[in-house]
Amino acid sequence: MDLIHTFLNLVAPPFTFFFLCLFLPPYWGLKFMVSILSWLLSENVAGKVVHITGASSGIGEYLAYEYAKRGACLALSARRETALHQVADTARHLGSPDVIVMRADVSKPEDCMRLIDQTVNHFGRLDHLVNNAAISIATLFEETPDISNLRPIMETNFWGSVYTTRYALQHLRKSRGKIVVMSSVDSWLPAPRRHIYSASKAALVSLYETLRVEVGSEIGITIVTPGYIESEITKGKFLSAQGEVDVDQDLRDVEVSAVPVGSVSGCAESIIKSTLRGDRCLTVPSWFRMTYLIKLLCPELLEWTFRLLYLTAPGTPTSDALSKKILDATGAKNLFYPPSIQSPDVKTD
């Protein structure tokens, strides 16, 4: 057996190289032609049924508006019912023929089952499932007194998507529908203080890439990896080391630094266009894909940069991080941060 592996270790690299040299040019040409056809034949969602989790704010809210503009029927869920009703009213005004709202916690399997059942019972079908609900963190791993305090991140970000997808699959098969998965560029970036959040987003990518193989062409899956987009997370809403939701905009300044924060409306528009084309994946803003290339080619450089920018010496306040000093010294916040994320009015429920 060891001899076989030794042989494969020698043969596999050159064989793979020559195979790719022959395969990639026609493959890329075919993909280009398919992308043109997909753009020309984008799905029409008028009258179709879309369920969006985490729809009370941020990307989920604006995805509801984009679907509404295209005439889709909406089922919106989140923990904040009052905010959901406000989103629903706007969606109706924008053109959605029917909108229902459901208060739910996607970390609970029974809530996820109820969400899908109520959607199908009301509309009679389900065409798109948008798994968007998420919470973030911004604390060093060793500074968390009880690591179990961070369980809600994985339970919401990962298991919440797992539960809703499992209960929705049979209905999506019938409609040959689509799943939109909200991962993050943090799924590949080694960002300090976002360890469990990054793990939850990376787990989503692995799960849905595997699920794509299992379901084949019956259900389309679009994996979205947003960068910094205006949302409650970029407003500074994090799960604290004590397991409580808190708002800390100084810490947000450390984490985001002088990186431009994208428009949530533009992000949502890009996501829905990508979904209707049937794209496999989308990174928005697209320039964040270069960070993945850097990670592949020189991971040590990426890790060193993150350590230099975001970490401070032991006993030194987090606000002394180089990332925040750069932000403050350049005045980049006024240029790169939308007014919406500089508002102190952020709900923590």
From Swiss-Prot:
A motif (Proline-knob) lies at residues 13-26. NCBIfam families: PRK06181.1. The keyword NAD does not apply. NADP(+) binds at residues 54-80, 105, 132-135, 197-201. Substrate binds at S184. The chain crosses the membrane at residues 10-30. It comes from Arachis hypogaea. This is 11-beta-hydroxysteroid dehydrogenase A. Has dehydrogenase activity against 11 beta-hydroxysteroid and 17 beta-hydroxysteroid. May be involved in signal transduction regulated by various sterols. Its main location: other.
